[in-house]
Amino acid sequence: VTLKVGASPSPHAEILEAAAPILAEQGIELDIVEFDDYVLPNTALADGSLDANYFQHQPYLTNFNAENGTDLVSAGSIHYEPLGLYAGKTASLDELADGAVIGIPADATNGGRALLLLQDLGVLTLKDGIDLDYFRNAEDITFSEYDGIAENPHNVQIEALEAANLPAALPDLDFAVINGNYAIPAGIADKLLATEDAAGDAAQVFANIVAVRAGDETRPEIEALVEVLKSDEVKSFIEEKYEGSVLPVA
């Protein structure tokens, strides 16, 4: 049996490559098709060109189905790309100076995740009731004028930038909170100071999934694919290769 699976080049296709030999032992051959965009893997799955894809999280898939009238579902959650706090001009949080500048992603969801991480790390405190759902449901937030911070003892300055531009800006910032998928190709794993908790809300909501056409999630070979991707062998591969910028789902 051959399974044709669409995937983003990193880390998804690399994780599938690690799973391929284990699946081959079960008589399942993986044909991995790499995509550089986030629309074609779903349209190709919907039209039957692919058996599955592996590149997105559930909120993105839910939104895609709603906008395109497709009926694609998750067959399982595999990994999570945590937001991490990376050292720029300042080497560690112990050296956090008054007025330090911290870069965060400009979009509401990821910027919100960044502020929640900074709260977990004791850098600042958000107003009561501000949680992940609050940021996910927010239309647009201008973080430069954001008034949801209750306590900011070090008077840190929050600088919101396009998520993809944060790694390049890191040398000019004291710290930055960066998405795993941008941190990996930037080669900044050695500057990682802390990440979101793998058992926390964001990890559950934004876990990357294997998606299939509705009804296919019970196909034996799809079940085998998900089982292998969640196996100890593949989990170890993820932990060793990505050094914390990609984590297996807890």
Positions of PLM-derived features:
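Pocket-flanking alpha-helical
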Residues: 38-69, 85, 186-188
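Alpha-to-beta junction loops
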Residues: 46-56, 100, 123, 153-157, ...
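Ligand-binding "clamshell"
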Residues: 63-75, 90-91, 172, 177, ...
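A conserved helix-loop-strand patch within extracytoplasmic ligand-binding domains
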Residues: 75-125, 235
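A bilobed periplasmic-binding-protein/Venus flytrap-type ligand-binding module shared by bacterial periplasmic
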Residues: 82-94, 206-221
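Periplasmic-binding protein-like
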Residues: 110-119, 221, 229-249
